[in-house]
Design a protein with these regions (language model features):
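A short, small-residue-rich loop immediately preceding and capping a beta-strand
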Residues: 21-24, 46-48, 66-105, 262-269, ...
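Glycine-rich, acidic loop regions that bind phosphate or pyrophosphate groups
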Residues: 91, 102-152, 239-334, 419-420, ...
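N-terminal cofactor/phosphate-binding cores enriched in small/glycine residues
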Residues: 3-74, 80-83, 89
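Active-site diphosphate/adenylate-binding microenvironment
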Residues: 8-12, 16-19, 26-30, 34-39, ...
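Glycine-rich, anion-gripping cofactor-binding loops and their flanking helix/strand elements
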Residues: 83, 216-290, 301, 368-398, ...
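Phosphate/pyrophosphate-binding active-site segments
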Residues: 1-6, 280-357, 461-509
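Thiamine diphosphate
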Residues: 101, 108-121, 366-509
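Conformationally flexible catalytic loops at phosphate/diphosphate-handling active centers
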Residues: 146-151, 155-208
Length: 509
């Protein structure tokens, strides 16, 4: 039997109709009627219980990365919703379609000193559009709520993908479950965008360019074969990082990027890790830049008055494979590639890296060819890195490696508060007892406030956390992490465990 609340039943029916199969659920009484419906629907949904809402949205991001379909989160009323906001912001900047469902208390109780009662409508703005899914007492309201839900779920694919927020007021009595069937709903078909064509002036510009450059920022969609072809044919110089996930194209990371002087740039993907390369391109006078993505945005990352083409980048890149000539300077640039320190070749399904030092260290340490690399580079915050890896591991078949710094780990330690995690999750915790990146910022060492108040020096260890969450704990000391990384990874990946494994490496800054 389902809830007696018509708005909850209509919401449940739309979740099924729009093929939302995975839902992260958090504890609470106000959202309990929604959770009951989700559970009652049986095999229609796979529920992922997460206690800490600060972790929940990041777990959903990890699930989306693995499954590439919208994921929902369901929380109770009050600050539970606000605790999800960092994860919703991360999803917004990476165009990840999450469905944020918040139970709410009646509007009449706001401002009356009732518990867990805050203004929730629009609380995720500007990171997620909000629809109010009000309680239904007559047919006209049902039509209106049905329309709102139809519109909301359709918006998941807008602007290249985006999170949405469904706020669901629920009045008492909450726990009456006597409805036999969910309502029938129909969904509207979306019209696919037409295939785009490269503008003629850009076709001519790239054909005549001496050293055309393709820059691939963070890329989480499937590998684009055209990029590999453009590189192999010496048609474009490809600059890509590990989180670009473009296989051998990312060898361009080992160029001396400060000496590059391209005369045309195509820019796709999200954030770049390499700040200095970005700053270098900003110094080149009148550099033509074409930004290609499926969103309505037009970031001018290199301060060059970039032009924008709204389409799937793979379509344009395949056109370039068919039309661009071989470039001698591109071939010469590739011949000057230095060898990476190490090629990452370990039996894992995916790698997740924390922000700040961790993502930069992995970029310098390894050329990662056959394993996808992920990082929360939407907002570039330290929160949620462990939870995202944990979320991915819930749906993974193989081992998932999380390389993370100490501050990020301790900040998000509740990502391990999950009874469904198993030995697939392996964590390489780099503990240099502070935020090490702050010690490498020019000029910051001049302030005596640096160690305690900026870099957050500490003496903490993850051993107690591992015990609390029933994880396998290993530790090691390393005076040179770059040299010791190989045998440390072998140690971390080879141990048998039915729960996540943490290898905490104590190393100097």
């Amino acid at each position: 039997m389902y809830s007696n609340k018509a708005n909850i039943n209509l919401l449940t029916a739309h979740l099924i109709a729009h093929d939302i199969r995975d839902i992260v659920v958090c504890p609470g009484s106000r959202n309990a009627p929604i959770v009951h419906n989700l559970y009652e629907a049986g095999s229609k949904f796979q529920l992922h219980p997460i206690t800490d809402e600060r972790s929940a949205a990041f777990v959903a991001i990890g699930l989306w990365i693995k499954k590439k379909r919208p994921i929902a989160i369901c929380v109770t009323s009050g600050s539970a919703l606000l605790n999800c906001l960092p994860g919703i912001a991360e999803a917004a900047f990476r165009h990840i379609p999450l469905v944020m469902i918040s139970a709410d208390r009646p509007l009449s109780l706001q401002g009356q000193l009732d518990g867990q009662t805050i203004p929730q409508q629009g609380a995720c703005t500007p990171y997620a559009r909000c629809w109010q899914i009000d309680e239904i007492t007559e047919d006209s309201q049902a039509r209106e709520v049905n329309h709102y839900l139809q519109t909301a779920f359709a918006a998941l694919s807008d602007n290249g993908g985006q999170p949405i927020h469904l706020n669901v007021p629920i009045s008492e009595p909450l726990f009456e479950f006597t409805t036999k069937e969910l309502p029938q709903v129909e969904i509207s078909a979306r019209v696919n965008k037409s295939v785009a064509k490269l503008p003629n002036h850009w076709q001519e510009l790239l054909c005549n360019a001496r050293l055309p450059l393709l820059i691939v920022g963070q890329y989480e969609e499937p590998f684009i074969p055209a990029i590999q072809q453009l590189r192999a044919n010496n048609q474009l110089l490809v600059y890509a990082e590990n989180i670009s996930n473009q296989q051998d194209a990312r060898m361009a990371l080992w160029l001396d990027e400060q000496k590059l002087s391209p005369d045309a740039v195509i820019h796709i993907g999200g954030c770049l890790v390499n700040k200095f390369f970005k700053q270098h391109l900003r110094t080149i006078n009148q550099l033509p830049v074409l930004r290609i993505d499926e969103t309505d945005e037009c970031p001018d990352t290199f301060f060059q008055k970039a032009e924008k083409l709204t389409c799937n980048p793979a379509e344009i890149l395949q056109q370039l494979v068919d039309t661009l000539p071989t470039k001698n300077e591109v071939a010469a640039a590739y011949s000057q590639l230095s060898s990476p320190k190490h090629t990452f070749d370990y039996p894992i399904e995916a790698m997740f890296v924390g922000n700040s030092t961790a993502v930069r260290w992995t970029n310098r340490q390894w050329q990662v060819l056959n394993v996808p690399v992920y990082c929360n580079r939407g907002t570039n915050g330290i929160e949620g890195s462990l939870s995202t890896a944990a979320g991915y591991s819930l749906a993974a078949a193989g081992k998932v490696l999380c390389v993370i710094g100490d501050l990020s780990f301790f900040y998000d330690a509740n990502g391990l508060w999950n009874q469904h995690l198993d030995g697939k999750l392996r964590i390489l915790l780099i503990n240099n007892q502070c935020g090490a990146i702050f010690h490498h910022l020019p000029g910051l060492n001049q302030t005596p406030a640096l160690p305690q108040f900026v870099a957050a020096a500490h003496q903490n260890s993850a051993k107690g956390i591992a015990e609390s969450y029933h994880c396998t704990y290993l530790s090691a000391e390393s005076s040179c992490l770059a040299e010791d990384a190989h045998h440390l990874l072998i140690k971390l990946l080879n141990i048998e465990s039915t729960r996540p494994v943490i290898l905490e490496v104590f190393t100097p800054i």
